[in-house]
Amino acid sequence: MLIKKRPSWAMAEADATSEHIYLNRREWLRAAGFAGLGLTTALTGVGGFAAAAVAAIEGYPAPRNMAYRLDRDITPEDDATTYTNFYEFGSSKNIWKRAQKLVTDPWMVTIDGLVETEMQLDAENLITKAGGLEERLYRHRCVEAWAMAVPWSGVPLANLVKLAKPKPEAKYLQMETFLDPSIAPGQKQSWYPWPYVEGLTLAEATNELAFLATGIYGKPMPAQNGAPIRLVTPWKYGFKSVKSITRFTFTDKQPVSFWEQLNGNEYGFWANVNPDVPHPRWSQKTERLLGSGKNVRTQLYNGYGEQVAGLYDGMFPNDDRKLFH
């Protein structure tokens, strides 16, 4: 995709120093030619040389889409991959070790509902059919008022929509994660409405920013970050970006999402970022950056308003606050 006008999130001059360091590692991996070494080391832990080598064999790092840049440093990898929400494995942030129980190969994905032909295929085949991998730099804003900036690898969600060939009456895309209490202790907690479900309008799903991520930091997605395939919607609060997706259902009814079922007054369907609409229990005016701990002012739509604000024009003329929780 070629964008002549510099997007609102792009830096005016050069990229952040940490991004240069990251790019140097990417180029070194390419030059080293790991793909011919026949390494079979499993991906373990949260980083390291062995993981990077295996990633190179599996097609990572993906080519960078330079239309998507950052206005801040990339978050250190260890912070982004060890401070995570994944309620299937517990409510603490330090669940990355527990999440390694998730088996992501093989991983079957179903596309059903209001489509021309329902299909079931493995995640790798799905991504292949949806187009080649690319890498994008996105900001990520959690509803809990922390944030990170990371390089995601994956494909535009619009490509999956095109592949699915939804019927004219389809208005929404519902996404569902795995259900396996034998490995995910959080799913044994019956007061949660498992499995985790999220949804978008088709207009949102086909927006240029909506992304299906399969990797991060130039490597396949770690389990704790939502392997093998997750949603990334950078203009929305992070709970909208459902992890470890097993089903895409096209429907004419607005999905009732996981957190909306639990407390729709605090975690609604739209969940767009807005610093001037507080959470009922805390302010959203600022965000704490993982890694540096620095507090910065939150931006409307997380800084992506130029690309997405038009999706919501006139939707709630009497109370647009519904769009921001």
List the predicted regions and their residue ranges.
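N-terminal secretory signal peptides
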Residues: 1-27, 36, 41-43, 51
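Serine/threonine-rich low-complexity intrinsically disordered regions
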Residues: 6-8, 12, 44-50, 110, ...
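Intrinsically disordered, low-complexity linkers and terminal tails enriched in Pro/Gly
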Residues: 34, 39-67
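Structured, non-membrane catalytic/scaffold regions adjacent to prosthetic-group chemistry
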Residues: 54-325
